[in-house]
Every structure is written in structure tokens, then in C-alpha cells.
């Protein structure tokens, strides 16, 4: 086709002039240069008089129903064809052969049921607009052909199923619009062959779920629009492998479940819209990976809480909307990690309290919207915002928060504030210097409840000084009656006077601090004076946030009022409020506040503490401890109580013997007392005293010191006792056992010896004798000295039963040792004799002494051999207490 076109262009001057190559604009169409406009002419077919050198042909808004192949033949220069808004049902597939250089084809708003056949022959086509037709079916091949077109619009059709396209040799597509169809499922990897795609629109379809890898391999995708579907779940890795993705919209769906890691590997995402869904919480899991996010819209959801750590994954966030959710309170440091946040929208929630550190750390915030909550207390009680500093905040919206009083320097923590919106608040009292030190450029308010007395006289001059727009400041008087409905700025300051009997609610008797024991009662009182009716509430601080108390089985609220004469509005009343807490628990240990209100304002008492005390109660008590001399005593004593009890120890003798000998140790944060190397002097009763302001308790334990030791200790040479088969085995563990307090327990191979016919015990079980030993009697034998449930010491003996040959061999070894010693002594004497010097006598005496030593050694070895036949100790293990 391209070769054919070039040939015609070359031969153009040599061909006869025919109608199809006419360059004259004839008929109703309007021609300007290479642009021919035949739109809105009620044409039923394409005119035959259109110049063949046309580059842009506009045929929109006509009545064309079909296009046959003979139309526009020879239009080799045509680049743009607009046949939108007709009633085209059919286009001959050979029609497109006539348009080899067409770049833009607009067929929107027609009645095509399929993508026109032959359109894939348009090798230079860059934009194809099929919006608002009747296309219901798209084949894999047709999708593959579309991959060669840079921009494709198939929105507002009837497509319900999207097949997976076949592999295309040419992929140029950058923008694909499938919005407003009936697609229910996009499957996995459906768009993977469109790897050049930059923008994908799937809004207004019927998609219900986003599965893993739904958009995988679209590494150039920057914008993804899934608005107005029926998506309920977004699965793990649904947006994986999208490194260029910058904008995602999931607004107006039914999303309630967001899997952890759904945005994993989306480091480039900057804008995320999740508004108008059913998201209930902001969690660290699904926020993971959003390190470049700048804009996050979570408005119109069902969020009740958010994890503070979740924001750590979005350090670059600049704009955050939580408008119209179900948040009731803001915890400490709610947005502390969002150092770059510039605008925060928290309007239309149910927020009634802020932690005193809820908004700290937001040093870059420029705009804050707290409208339509119940946060009047944050302004009226200056202590709430005292710890909140926003040095760069320029705009604050605080509309519809039931604000009645603006105290002195209410907004001083926002020194850069320029715009303040207080509309839809029943403001009654604006104290002098309420807006200091601000230099506001815009103030918006519309209150008709102002109490016009001397305290409001400054307002008009302040408005004039700052040159504020008076039309945005509606402040009308409601009291006193002569000034009702007058604008404050229009009243002469001489008429704004104060009386001693102000109608404002005022606390005339502050509550005081209360101390009580756990399980007892606590009572607070608060007296209020002002215009009736007065309302009084009690608040308690819990985890830095106030909570209004309501009456229940353990909380009693009462108000005694003075009589109201004639029931008129101008009357005053004195109300005495009482808060009674019954059966006080440790959880009641907090700060309490009395809040008084009437239509003219509110007053807040100081925060007073309820000190709940609990008498000491032992969690661990010391226990009696038997020990041997030289061992270490360790007594444990621990107690709980409020305030924390002080632990002290006492000994029945004063002073501590161990303390004088510097053997008594107590370490910080340790509930033990240590007595090192105990002696008999340390024996006695030790008493632990736990004391605090609520009371004291004590517990005692006895230290019993014994002086036992084994009479026959052996060196731990690891050699076993050798016993000849059928001989008797005797193990002696004599240790001056006290039979009334102590007992000896024998074990073989760590098992208690209970029933063994040939085992005999004597001397209060201190001696064990085994008769007729066999090879099976070899092993480990131990004797343990016990006092009640405490072991004092243990001795282990290793026994080996051998046959007669092995036993004789061991005896021969002992005899050889004696003979060697004697030979050495004789040799030494012979050497000395050979010297022949004058010290022969001295040397002889030395040799004689050596011989005597050898004899004594031989005797000791023999005694040792005999002793081994009776008792051989392997080791003595002291018991550590």
C-alpha cells in the first residue's frame, strides 16, 4: 500500500485530472487550507466533492449510517478524520486502504457493534476514538491490533469480557480508556503485552476484585483509574512490578479489605485516592511501600482508628484527608512522623477529644481543617492546645464545633495563622486579646449569640486595625436585650458596659484534690454561678485524653440548684455539683475536671488529682531456709501497693551479724537479700517489712545453719572404686546426721534406692553395704543429706565391679610403686659412697631418711587400698541455695 501511494504521488502530474483528485472545495463544506469542515450538515454519506489534498476532514454531527470502500479513495494526505456523532453502523474494511497516512480517527458516538475491520491496516494511526458506541465484544486479535495505536478510547461501550490479547509485533500504546463498560474481571496479566502503557482507565465498570499481578509487567504505567467499580478486596501484590506508577484512584468502590503488601514495590506512587469506600482502619501492613506518596485521600470511609506507625511508611506525605470518617479521638503523636505534611483534613468526624500531644511534630503544616466535630473544649480550655505548636500554620477551619467561648490568646501556638474560619459556632464570649498575637488576613464567623458587655468592646477597633473584611464577620448581640440583634462593630463602645452580675457560667468554688484507699469512696464538689439553665459535666483524663463521665453503678452525679424565680431568662442560679466514685479502683487514679456551661459561655476548673492508695500486699514472702556453714542464704520478699511499698529487713538480733562482717548484700531493683558464707551466728528469724502511706505488713522466715560434713572425703581423681566380684561394697557417708531434722537419701544412677535385697543401711542410713556384688552393681552411687524439702550436700562415688584377674593386676601395680621408691633410695646411697668425701655421714642420713619415707609411702598405699575396698568418694558437691 505504501509503495502504491508513493507511485501515485510520483505520477501525479502525469495522470489525467479526475474527480477523485479534485482540489476544489465544492458544495456545502467549508474549506480553510487543508482543513475541510463538513460537520453539522445532516449529511447521509460522505460527499464526493471533497478535495483529495485534505489533511483534516471533519464530518461530525451528521446522519451518516455507513461508509463503503469507494469513499475517500486517493486521500493519501489525510491525517485526521472525524466522523463522530453520526449513526454509523458499518464501515467497509477496504475503506481504510484508502487512508495510508491517517493518524487520528474519531468515530465516537456512533452505533458500531464491533471494532471496525481493517482499521489495523492504518499503519500510521496514533489515536483511535471509539467512545460511546455499542461495542460489546472484543477479540484477542483486535486487542493485539490496538496495541500498535498510541491512544485508544473504548469508553462508554458495552464490553463485559476482556480477553487476553495475543502477542503483537508492534506495541506503541500509551493510553487505553476502557471506562464506563461492564467489565467484571480483569484477571491476571491481561495487560502484560501492553508494556508501553502509560495511562489505563477502568473507571465505571463492574470489577469486584483485584488479584495478584493484575497489572504486572506494565513497567511504564503512570496512571491507573479504577474509580466507581464494585471492588471489595485488593489482594496482596495487586499493584506489584509497577515502578513508574504515580497515580492510583480507587474512589467510590466498596473496598473494605486491603491486604498487607498491596502496594509493595510501588516506590514511585505519589497520589492515592481511596475515598468513598468502607475502609475501617489505617494499618501498617497495607501502607507498606508508599515511600514516595505525597497525596492520600481517605475521606468518606469508616475509619475509626489508625496505627501511628502506619505513617512511617509515607514520610513524604504532603496532603492527607480523613474527612467524614468515624474517628472519635486522636492519640499522642498521631501524625508526628509526617514532617512534610502541609494540609490535614479531619472534618466531619466524631472527634470530641485530643490528646495534649496529638498534633505535636507537625512543623510544616500550612492548612488544618477540624470542622464539624465537637472540639470546642480544645479552644475553650487553653490547656489542651498548650503543648501544640504549629509555627507555619496559615489556615485553620474550625466551623461547626459548638464553640461558645474564645479565651485570651486562644491561638497563640499558631503565630503564622492568616485565615481563621469559625462559622456555624454559637460564639457568645470573645475575651480581650483572644486573637493575639495573630496578624489575621481573613476571619470568618457568623454568631448571633454574642454577650455584648465591656469584654467585647475591643473587637471593632481590632477589626479596623487589621483591615479585615467586615462582610465575612457576622457578630450580633443577644444580650443585654436592648442591644439584641445589633452588630457588635456598629455599637458605640460607651454602651458596652459590664456588671458584677454577669450571666456567664462561672465556677465559684473549685474542686480540690482527693485521697482515698482502694475500695473506698471519693467525692468531688464544684459550685457554679450564672444565667440559667446551667449544665455541669465532669471529665476524667485517660491516657492524656478527656472523657466525659456518665452515671453508672459506681459513678454518681448530682446537681443541687437554687430556685428559679418566675422562670425568666434573666434569672441566675447557683448550682452545686457533686461527683461520687464508689468502690474506687486503681484505674480511677487520674485527673478530674469540672466543666460548666450556659448559652453565654463555659468555664473550666483546674485539673485536680484523685490519689488512690493501696496498702502493701505481698507478692512473694520469704521462706524458711536450712543451710550448711559457708553456703549463701537468699531470701525473697516483694510487695505491691500504691505508692510503691518500701521494703526493710529486721533480724531477731540487733545488729545483723552478717552486716558487721560485711557479708550482707542488697542490690538495686532486686527483691532478694543475700547473706554470704553463713555462720551459726546468722541463724534466727528474718522479718520483711513492707510499708507505705496506706499501711504496712510483714512476713518472717527462719535461717537454720547446720555444721555437717562428710567424715571420709576423697580427692576427686575420677578413678572408680574397684570391687572384686562377689565381694561386699561399703560406702560410708557419715556426717553427724541429726536424725530428728535430717535424713539421708541414697541413689544409684540418679534413681532412689528403695527395694534392693542385698542393700543394707546402718548408722541412720549413713552407711550403705551391698553384698555379693555383680557386674551390674557398677555405676554411680550418691548420698544426699536432706532437711525437709531442701538438700544440703551430696557425695558421689563411682563403683566398678571387676573379676579377680583385674583386681590382682591393680594390687601388683601398687607393689611395683613401693619397689621403685626403695630402689631409688639404694641407688642414691651408692652414689654418695663413691664420692669418698667428708660429708658421707650427712649423705647417709639423707639416704636413710629417704628409705624411711619410702616405707611410710608403702604403708600409706596399703592403707589406701584397704580403704578403697570399703569406701571411695568421687566428688562432694555443695548445694547452692
Swiss-Prot record:
The chain crosses the membrane at residues 841-861. The gene is sma-10. One of its GO terms (cellular component) is extracellular space. Residues 1-20 form the signal peptide. One of its GO terms (molecular function) is type I transforming growth factor beta receptor binding. The keyword Cell membrane applies. Interacts with sma-6 and daf-1. Residues 503-611, 616-704, 716-785 form the Ig-like C2-type domain. Gene3D superfamilies: Immunoglobulins, Ribonuclease Inhibitor. Glycans are attached at residues 247, 273, 387, 446, 495, 560, 566, 677. Residues 21-840 are extracellular. Pfam families: I-set, LRR_1, LRR_8. Disulfide bonds join 526-594, 637-688, 733-783. Binds to the TGF-beta receptors sma-6 and daf-4, and enhances TGF-beta signaling activity in vitro. Has a role in regulation of body size. It is a single-pass membrane protein; Lipid-anchor; GPI-anchor. Residues 24-50 form the LRRNT domain. InterPro entries: Ig-like_dom, Ig-like_dom_sf, Ig-like_fold, Ig_I-set, Ig_sub, Ig_sub2, Leu-rich_rpt, Leu-rich_rpt_typical-subtyp. One of its GO terms (biological process) is positive regulation of transforming growth factor beta receptor signaling pathway. LRR repeats lie at residues 51-74, 75-98, 99-122, 124-145, 146-169, 170-193, 195-217, 218-241, 242-265, 267-289, 290-313, 314-337, 339-361, 362-388, 390-413, 415-437, 440-465. It comes from Caenorhabditis elegans. Residues 862-881 are cytoplasmic. This is Leucine-rich repeats and immunoglobulin-like domains protein sma-10. It comes from the Eukaryota.
Amino acid at each position: 500500500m505504501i509503495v502504491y501511494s508513493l507511485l501515485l504521488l510520483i505520477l501525479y502530474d502525469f495522470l489525467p485530472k479526475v474527480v477523485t483528485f479534485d482540489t476544489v472545495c465544492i458544495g456545502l463544506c467549508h474549506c480553510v487550507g487543508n482543513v475541510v469542515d463538513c460537520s453539522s450538515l445532516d449529511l447521509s454519506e460522505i460527499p464526493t466533492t471533497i478535495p483529495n489534498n485534505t489533511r483534516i476532514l471533519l464530518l461530525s454531527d451528521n446522519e451518516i449510517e455507513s461508509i463503503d470502500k469507494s469513499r475517500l479513495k486517493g486521500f493519501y494526505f489525510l491525517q485526521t478524520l472525524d466522523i463522530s456523532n453520526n449513526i454509523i453502523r458499518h464501515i467497509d474494511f477496504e475503506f481504510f486502504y484508502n487512508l495510508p497516512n491517517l493518524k487520528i480517527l474519531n468515530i465516537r458516538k456512533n452505533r458500531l457493534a464491533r471494532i471496525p475491520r481493517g482499521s489495523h491496516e492504518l499503519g500510521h494511526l496514533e489515536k483511535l476514538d471509539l467512545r460511546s458506541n455499542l461495542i460489546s465484544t472484543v477479540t484477542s486479535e483486535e486487542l493485539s491490533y490496538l496495541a500498535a495505536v498510541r491512544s485508544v478510547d473504548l469508553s462508554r461501550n458495552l464490553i463485559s469480557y476482556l480477553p487476553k490479547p495475543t502477542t503483537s509485533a508492534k506495541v506503541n500504546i500509551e493510553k487505553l480508556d476502557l471506562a464506563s463498560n461492564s467489565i467484571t474481571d480483569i484477571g491476571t496479566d491481561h495487560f502484560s503485552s501492553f508494556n508501553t502503557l502509560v495511562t489505563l482507565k477502568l473507571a465505571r465498570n463492574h470489577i469486584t476484585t483485584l488479584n495478584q499481578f493484575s497489572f504486572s509487567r506494565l513497567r511504564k504505567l503512570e496512571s491507573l483509574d479504577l474509580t466507581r467499580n464494585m471492588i471489595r478486596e485488593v489482594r496482596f501484590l495487586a499493584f506489584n512490578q509497577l515502578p513508574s506508577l504515580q497515580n492510583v484512584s480507587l474512589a467510590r468502590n466498596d473496598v473494605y479489605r486491603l491486604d498487607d503488601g498491596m502496594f509493595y514495590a510501588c516506590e514511585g506512587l505519589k497520589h492515592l485516592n481511596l475515598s468513598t469506600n468502607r475502609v475501617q482502619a489505617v494499618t501498617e501492613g497495607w501502607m507498606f511501600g508508599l515511600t514516595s506518596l505525597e497525596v492520600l485521600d481517605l475521606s468518606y470511609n469508616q475509619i475509626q482508628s489508625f496505627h501511628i506507625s502506619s505513617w512511617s511508611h509515607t514520610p513524604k506525605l504532603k496532603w492527607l484527608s480523613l474527612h467524614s470518617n468515624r474517628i472519635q479521638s486522636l492519640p499522642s503523636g498521631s501524625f508526628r512522623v509526617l514532617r512534610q505534611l502541609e494540609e490535614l483534613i479531619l472534618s466531619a468526624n466524631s472527634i470530641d477529644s485530643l490528646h495534649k500531644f496529638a498534633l505535636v511534630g507537625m512543623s510544616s503544616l500550612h492548612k488544618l481543617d477540624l470542622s464539624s466535630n465537637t472540639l470546642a473544649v480544645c479552644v475553650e480550655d487553653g490547656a489542651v492546645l498548650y503543648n501544640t505548636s504549629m509555627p507555619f500554620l496559615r489556615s485553620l477551619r474550625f466551623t461547626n464545633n459548638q464553640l461558645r467561648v474564645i479565651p485570651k490568646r486562644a491561638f497563640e501556638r499558631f503565630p503564622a495563622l492568616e485565615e481563621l474560619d469559625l462559622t456555624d459556632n454559637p460564639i457568645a464570649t470573645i475575651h480581650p486579646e483572644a486573637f493575639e498575637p495573630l496578624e489575621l488576613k481573613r476571619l470568618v464567623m457568623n454568631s448571633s449569640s454574642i454577650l455584648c458587655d465591656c469584654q467585647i468592646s475591643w473587637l471593632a477597633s481590632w477589626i479596623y486595625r487589621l483591615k479585615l473584611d467586615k462582610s465575612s464577620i457576622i457578630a450580633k448581640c443577644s444580650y443585654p436585650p436592648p442591644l439584641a440583634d445589633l452588630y457588635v462593630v456598629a455599637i458605640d463602645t460607651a454602651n458596652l458596659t459590664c456588671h458584677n452580675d454577669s450571666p456567664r457560667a462561672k465556677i465559684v468554688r473549685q474542686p480540690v484534690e482527693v485521697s482515698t484507699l482502694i475500695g473506698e469512696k471519693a467525692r468531688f464538689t464544684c459550685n457554679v454561678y450564672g444565667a440559667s439553665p446551667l449544665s455541669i459535666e465532669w471529665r476524667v483524663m485517660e491516657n492524656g485524653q478527656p472523657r466525659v463521665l456518665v452515671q453508672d453503678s459506681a459513678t454518681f452525679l448530682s446537681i443541687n440548684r437554687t430556685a428559679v424565680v418566675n422562670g425568666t431568662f434573666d434569672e441566675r442560679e447557683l448550682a452545686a455539683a457533686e461527683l461520687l466514685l464508689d468502690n474506687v479502683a486503681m484505674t480511677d487514679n487520674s485527673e478530674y475536671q469540672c466543666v460548666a456551661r450556659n448559652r453565654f459561655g463555659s468555664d473550666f476548673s483546674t485539673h485536680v488529682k484523685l490519689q488512690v492508695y493501696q496498702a502493701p500486699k505481698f507478692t512473694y514472702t520469704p521462706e524458711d531456709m536450712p543451710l550448711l556453714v559457708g553456703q549463701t542464704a537468699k531470701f525473697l520478699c516483694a510487695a505491691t501497693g500504691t505508692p510503691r511499698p518500701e521494703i526493710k529487713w529486721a533480724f531477731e538480733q540487733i545488729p545483723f551479724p552478717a552486716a558487721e562482717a560485711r557479708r550482707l548484700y542488697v542490690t538495686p531493683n532486686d527483691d532478694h537479700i543475700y547473706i554470704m558464707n553463713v555462720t551459726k551466728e546468722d541463724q534466727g528469724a528474718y522479718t520483711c517489712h513492707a510499708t507505705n502511706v496506706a499501711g504496712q505488713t510483714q512476713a518472717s522466715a527462719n535461717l537454720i545453719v547446720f555444721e555437717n560434713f562428710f567424715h571420709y572425703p576423697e580427692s576427686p581423681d575420677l578413678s572408680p572404686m574397684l570391687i572384686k566380684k562377689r565381694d561386699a561394697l561399703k560406702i560410708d557417708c557419715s556426717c553427724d546426721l541429726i536424725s530428728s531434722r535430717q535424713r539421708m537419701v541414697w541413689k544409684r544412677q540418679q534413681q532412689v534406692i528403695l527395694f534392693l535385697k542385698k542393700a543394707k543401711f546402718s548408722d541412720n542410713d549413713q552407711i550403705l553395704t551391698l553384698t555379693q556384688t555383680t557386674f551390674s552393681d557398677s555405676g554411680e552411687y550418691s548420698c544426699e543429706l536432706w532437711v525437709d524439702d531442701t538438700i544440703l550436700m551430696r557425695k558421689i562415688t563411682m563403683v566398678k565391679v571387676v573379676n579377680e584377674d583385674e583386681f590382682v593386676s591393680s594390687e601388683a601395680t601398687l607393689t611395683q610403686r613401693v619397689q621403685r621408691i626403695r630402689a631409688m633410695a639404694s641407688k642414691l646411697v651408692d652414689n654418695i659412697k663413691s664420692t669418698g668425701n667428708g660429708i658421707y655421714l650427712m649423705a647417709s642420713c639423707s639416704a636413710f631418711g629417704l628409705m624411711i619415707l619410702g616405707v611410710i609411702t608403702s604403708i600409706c598405699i596399703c592403707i589406701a587400698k584397704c580403704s578403697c575396698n570399703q569406701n571411695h568418694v568421687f566428688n562432694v558437691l555443695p548445694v547452692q541455695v
